[in-house]
Amino acid sequence: MRKPVFYGALALSAAMLSCPALAQDSKQVRIGLGDIATVETLNLLIALERVKERGVDVELTAFKDEDVAAQAVVNGQVDVGIGTPYALIQKVEAPIRLFYQLSTLKFYPVVDQEVYPDWQALDGQPFVYHGRGSGTEAMGNLLAEQNGIEFGEISYVPGSEVRAVALMQGNIKATFLDIANTNLVMEQAPGKFHVLPTGDVNASDEALYARLDWLQENEETVQILLEELLKTWRDINQNPEMVAAERERLGLLPDLPEDLEAQIDPYFEQAVGEAMFPDDGGGEAAAQSDFAFYTEAGQLEGEPEELNVEDFWYLEPVEKARAAVQG
């Protein structure tokens, strides 16, 4: 199985990082995205608007990929990152911890069905992931092993919508897409692509993570952030159509193309139906599921039952937020 490459530049950053005392609870949170904001980030954008209404200054920055966003968190350029940096924590001993599960892994291997009728046809063939160390790469590693194949050249293209366009233009032939872009590709190019079987996958796709010292010194800000995430996720799980309504009310992503705008309701309805947005923010149960998945996928070393949750997660914030919103 092809072994992923992990955050080489970050090892130096983590090792050389000095740790000056931070200002006590600044009521500000700087969040780094390793992707552009689009349909699948609308739930986060809605929650962040609610955080702002509670007096927290929110700054959202899009980086070119998750590696760069992770480095920004480690170096203190932003406070919070989004991803699943288990390998970064284990291999580089970066001083960061996951603290909230945003979504579970729901990606689909969409391929040109004439070229790749099944998994075996992909043996030795190119495959495209979102980024190094991403959930899509872990999923690809696992599925390749389960199907007895090894991919050929691996490329990394951040952004599911970017990969969808590349598929339809014929620039790539096989990749993972999220729900919205899988539906879009199937609608716009009927009969050309199909989704290969994946079986059951139970793992985090995106989680919030931050430097442990920042989490401990900004407890009130973190509490507000997580309370609003919990409430927003629960609102969406009760009524997925609220996302489109809130987007319009708040003026979010005003330049979203019409074809993607049409995917808002289908995306969130399907995502809710597949339990993509946890009501509880994850925590210990999510960590244990992640250990099983990411060790099997080759992104974590060791036996899942021997890994310590506290080495990767800081559980106190989500537990306090759940208590505050009753559940």
How would you name each of these model-derived features?
Residues 85-86, 162-254:
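Pocket-lining segment of extracytoplasmic ligand-binding domains
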Residues 19-23:
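Sec/Tat signal peptide C-region and signal peptidase I cleavage site
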Residues 24-159, 164-169, 173-179, 193-202:
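Short, glycine-/small- and polar/acidic-enriched structural segments
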Residues 1-8:
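Bacterial N-terminal signal peptides that target proteins for export
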Residues 288-327:
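Conserved C-terminal helix/tail region of periplasmic/extracytoplasmic solute-binding proteins
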Residues 58, 151, 254, 301-302:
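Residue-level detector of short coil/turn "hinge" positions at structural boundaries
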Residues 217-301:
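Secondary-structure end/capping motifs
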Residues 8-18:
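Bacterial N-terminal signal peptides
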